[in-house]
Amino acid sequence: MRLSTATLLLLLASCLSPGHGILEAHYTNLKCRCSGVISTVVGLNIIDRIQVTPPGNGCPKTEVVIWTKMKKVICVNPRAKWLQRLLRHVQSKSLSSTPQAPVSKRRAA
């Protein structure tokens, strides 16, 4: 009888212990899209789409995924200087090309 009680308590304790940190410590988290990244420059003429995914949803790192026009997926190092310049350029283009909302003039009463 004692053996089954001890086994039951051990099973209960293992169910209540946090396991989230253990998986991240051993890098066994499979929710990241990129298993490896490159830092070499990707030609602008072959880029179809860029996606930047911040840490979260089970992946502890920022990921930058580039889809080429040939439907190839490339994971790029988010700290690569050429990529940082490209993202700043794209962001400034999108901000400058956004039309401004119309402003209605009100008369003072």
Curated annotation (Swiss-Prot):
Tissue localization of expression: Found in spleen (B-cell-rich zone or follicles), Peyer patches (strongest within germinal centers and extending to the mantle zone) and lymph nodes (in reticular pattern in follicles).
GO BP term, example: immune response
Family annotation (InterPro entries): Chemokine_b/g/d, Chemokine_CXC, Chemokine_CXC_CS, Chemokine_IL8-like_dom, CXC_Chemokine_domain, Interleukin_8-like_sf
Domain of life: Eukaryota
Annotated signal sequence range: 1-21
SUPFAM superfamilies: Interleukin 8-like chemokines
GO terms assigned for molecular function: CCR10 chemokine receptor binding; chemokine activity; CXCR3 chemokine receptor binding; CXCR5 chemokine receptor binding; fibroblast growth factor binding; heparin binding; receptor ligand activity
KW Kinase (keyword) present: no
Compartment(s): Secreted
Pfam families: IL8
GO terms for cellular component: extracellular region; extracellular space
Disulfide bond annotation, renumbered to this chain: C32-C59, C34-C75
Entry keyword set: Chemotaxis, Cytokine, Disulfide bond, Inflammatory response, Secreted, Signal
UniProt family annotation: Belongs to the intercrine alpha (chemokine CxC) family.
PANTHER family, alphabetized: C-X-C MOTIF CHEMOKINE 13, SMALL INDUCIBLE CYTOKINE A
General function of this protein: Strongly chemotactic for B-lymphocytes, weakly for spleen monocytes and macrophages but no chemotactic activity for granulocytes. Binds to BLR1/CXCR5. May play a role in directing the migration of B-lymphocytes to follicles in secondary lymphoid organs.
Name of the protein in its database record: C-X-C motif chemokine 13
Gene from which the chain derives: Cxcl13
